[in-house]
Amino acid sequence: MKKTILLLVLSFFCTALFSQTNKAKKATSSSVFAKSDNVSAEMVKNKFYLFITNKGAKKDTILLKSFEVDKLPLECKIEPFMTKGIILHKITWQEKKTLQSKLKTEAALTTVSIICELASKTKVLSNEQTTTKITEIHFLDDKQTVSETIDRIRNEGFECIVNKQGEVVLKNKAKENKMVYVTADKKFVFVSAGPSKKKK
């Protein structure tokens, strides 16, 4: 009887230890959201990294963003491109956020773009563009017995586009700005607009 109890205790102890080990492994494991050649975008716990796998299996990392618990990047892409003889990588993903009350709902979709130079492990440009769909209930009388639903869209920020020349174009419905890469400073700068033409 004593031997049986001892075996049960040992079995329970081993099971608990195995379970804890598995949990620890899961907590430190990463999830891959996008990959391009030796570059991958991965989530470790709540931190979103760009991993660069070098020869000899050594990995470099660039921290892209820290997320709130239970939040994840969506539709992630990695796009390498050449500018001024240097290869840069554009990482793009989406984030969703919803604010809701009894009379109003705001569903926001944010597109985040970060451009990195891998050699120096530098983020050379960050951009966010948000489109928010707003749904509101408006009452047409004081007693709030008759109502109508109004939908509208709010756009904020600029779309981030990389053209064939390796230049960044930030555009929305109202304006368009071009940026070029300055290798010495490791950053994109706006192209100065020339003087406006005078009417004759």
Language-model-detected regions and their locations in the chain:
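Bacterial Sec-dependent N-terminal signal peptides
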Residues: M1-K26
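Exposed acidic/polar residues on beta-strands and adjacent loops within beta-sheet cores, strongest
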Residues: Q20-K200
